[in-house]
Amino acid sequence: MSSMERKKFHLSNRHMSEHIDYENIFTPQGMLGHVSKHPNLDFLMNIFNIPRVYSVSGFGTWNVGQHTVAVAFLALYWSAFNAYPQEKRDRLVTLALVHDVHEAVIGDILPFFKTTAVREAIEAIQRDILSAFAIEEDQTLHDELKLLDMMGFLYEISQSSPKGIDPSKRKLIKQMYARQKEQILGYAEEAEIDEEKVNEFLKSMKL
């Protein structure tokens, strides 16, 4: 085996052996392995103490809890806009309320920093919490939930202000807003969600 092959073999083995023992992580509510399976209200409410990455970057003061509630309200508006039956509306709102609940313990992490091991741990924690409430992921609503999540960020950008930094950064906020709106419409097309309807909904929400 050449030195290059040995290096590749070593990296492959290291990648396969990567694992985050999240169950033994201590939290103020107890060991995460227990808390994620039996989440108490203190644990869940911690999302209001977790700053959004966008806020950490210097724009606004939003936390994960505010984002979560915004997405849940958007799910209500979206359901009314589409005249969804009560069962579908309630399902979508429930999923919106818990879509980022794992961030109560891991925080808001940029996708770039989510390694395979980190993603696996996040998914396991999320599954634990959903199972505690007998909530199952609904693939039929996955695309709409993702769309609403993106709209929630668009609303967050619209509410932000460059406090403590050069006012010229307002131009940057406008650019970020325009880019996020483009991404929403692009995702709608990709997910085969009526783009015209999405545009109409955004206008109705003044976004």
Residue locations for each model-derived region?
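Post-HExxH zinc-binding segment in Zn-dependent metallohydrolases
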Residues: A121-E137
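Alpha-helical scaffolds flanking conserved acidic
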Residues: H38, P85-V101, T140-M151
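Short alpha-helical hairpin
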Residues: H34-V56
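Active-site-flanking alpha-helical
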Residues: H102, I106-G107, E156
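Post-HEXXH active-site segment of zinc metalloproteases
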Residues: I109-E123
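Divalent metal-dependent phosphate-bond-processing catalytic cores, especially two-metal-ion Mg2+/Mn2+ enzymes
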Residues: Q139-L207
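Alpha-helical phosphate/pyrophosphate-handling elements in metalloenzyme active cores
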Residues: S57-R91
